[in-house]
Amino acid sequence: MTTTKKPKKTTRASTPIEDLPPNPFVFEVLNVVNKQRSTAKKVEALKKFEHDSLKALFIWNFDETVISLLPPGEVPYSSLKDEQNSSGTLSTKIGQQASTMRFNDTVNTNQGFTTLRREWTKLYNFIKGGNDKLNGLRRETMFIQILQGLHPLDAEILCLVKDKELQKKYKITRSMVCLLYTSDAADEHSCG
């Protein structure tokens, strides 16, 4: 009689999702989510730091029926002070600041006067059906003012969401967001 040994299943201890300070920046939450390896852990991290601002950004980014009224691409703005220091669009400057912060692995949370947690209620102004009476110039000016007040990494996220390109930088998919916000299996199939 021969006995076959069953392979031992080794389970790796699940690493806990790191804690963030109260009211974290959106980029901090997305960085924590990005570090998770499995979809289940990413969804768990998103649930842990769930906030209406994240939901609004995910809807704008992943819902095809939400149409941005802002022009796609770079945000074409620079103040006189910025032009004296360097040239380029606001998007370029935000990207440069963001990459410098990532390169130095430092985050100065004092940069920016506001956060997406506070400003998300104004996002309706930038999508079709939100505030259609607003003229294009005023809409773009409002968007630029919000970007200038945000932390550069949050501003970069808002620029990505405007163009529905959040998934190009962060490992977050539409199906992952559906898993996060659907309550039953019937709703899950409609996310497809």
Provide a role label for each language-model segment:
Residues M1-S183, S190:
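N-terminal nucleic-acid-engaging modules of covalent nucleotidyltransferase systems
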